Amino acid sequence: MKTILASETMEIPEGVTVQVAAKVVTVEGPRGKLTRNFKHLNLDFQLLEGGRKLQVDAWFGTRRTMAAIRTAISHVQNLITGVTKGYRYKMRFVYAHFPINASITNSNTAIEIRNFLGEKKVRKVDMLEGVTILRSEKVKDELVLDGNDIELVSRSAALINQKCHVKNKDIRKFLDGIYVSDKGTITEDA
């Protein structure tokens, strides 16, 4: 069965401007500017009330198109959170015997991992565009990844995690690696 028209609206907070041009949504806020392309979705985007509300419509949509409405709104909310608060992922080093040695290079945009499982090989991971990496000052063996785009921050964390993958061993026993321990925003809610 097809629904004739399904729509959902979302509020746009103060201090954030949203522009829509041919299914490309641009969100600008105090932390910067993010753009997302929704051309692959069969949806209509329009701004209401002088740019204070965003409405997403689906005409004659199937179940999959109806689900895409909420997905698109969630993506735009992630963009708004990114340009207002920013995203922060924390990663911890886990090792049983050989301490993992990590050094941050390229002005906080790359990390070199040494002594993983006692190996001599140096593993280098470049962060994706707009993501910075720091060693935590308060907690030992912790990395902090900061950025505005949640997808780039989480993918950078995944790249670090995958570089420290234990091969040819039982991963239930060899738990060494760098794992995500906390996900949140840079500016905490008061």
Swiss-Prot record:
Keywords: Ribonucleoprotein, Ribosomal protein. GO terms for molecular function: rRNA binding; structural constituent of ribosome. GO terms for biological process: cytoplasmic translation. Pfam families: Ribosomal_L6 (PF00347). GO terms for cellular component: cytosolic large ribosomal subunit. Belongs to the universal ribosomal protein uL6 family. This is Large ribosomal subunit protein uL6.
